């Protein structure tokens, strides 16, 4: 284990270091510190790994104890690739994770990441058009959707339909 991977055992959801996972609403997460420095929560090892590969900056990780060995190589790659300082890895019992989420956490891992800067719509669309080359472009626009389950389903459907970009 590298020095920059800081594993911290958690025994209570009252721990202030877990605020992003336990006590903050989606709106509060968007506005943590300043709007441009908000955070978002990623759920599952697969989603976390994709976020890391996409270059999102992790704030912390929270996982069930049985996931630590599986996730440690990802944490170590992140530290080596990014040269990041210590990123806390909070480890809790699976029972505590279930208490947090209200259900059996089969995917066992959560992560808080810094939100990327919001880019202007025209800049986003320009990038989508450029990436598409000569073929027609398909963009999905989400307006007023607040349920993360619906948003996740829409993103998965958009990926299956080869949508080029999603405006949220």
Language-model features: locations:
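Boundary-proximal intrinsically disordered activation/regulatory segments immediately upstream
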Residues: 1-77
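RNA substrate-binding interface of SAM-dependent RNA methyltransferases
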Residues: 5-8, 46, 53, 81-86, ...
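A generic local structural motif
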Residues: 27, 48-49, 97-98, 153-155
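Phosphate/diphosphate ligand-binding glycine-rich loop within oxidoreductases
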Residues: 66-105
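Broad gene-expression machinery/nucleic-acid interaction feature
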Residues: 108
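Glycine-rich phosphate-binding loops that contact phosphosugars or nucleotide phosphates
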Residues: 111
């Amino acid at each position: 284990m590298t020095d920059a991977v800081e594993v911290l055992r958690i025994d209570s959801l009252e721990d202030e270091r877990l605020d992003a996972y336990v006590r903050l609403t989606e709106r509060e997460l968007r506005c943590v510190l300043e709007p441009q420095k908000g955070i978002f929560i990623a759920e599952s090892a697969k989603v976390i790994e994709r976020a890391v590969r996409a270059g999102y900056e992790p704030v912390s990780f929270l996982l069930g104890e049985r996931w630590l060995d599986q996730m440690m190589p990802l944490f170590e790659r992140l530290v080596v690739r990014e040269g990041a300082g210590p990123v806390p890895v909070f480890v809790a019992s699976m029972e505590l994770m279930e208490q947090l989420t209200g259900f059996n956490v089969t995917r066992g891992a959560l992560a808080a990441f810094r939100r990327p800067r919001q880019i202007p719509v025209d800049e986003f669309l320009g990038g989508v058009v450029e990436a598409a080359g000569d073929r027609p472009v398909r963009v999905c626009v989400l307006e007023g959707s607040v349920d993360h389950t619906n948003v996740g389903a829409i993103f998965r459907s958009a990926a299956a339909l080869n949508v080029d970009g999603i405006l949220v």
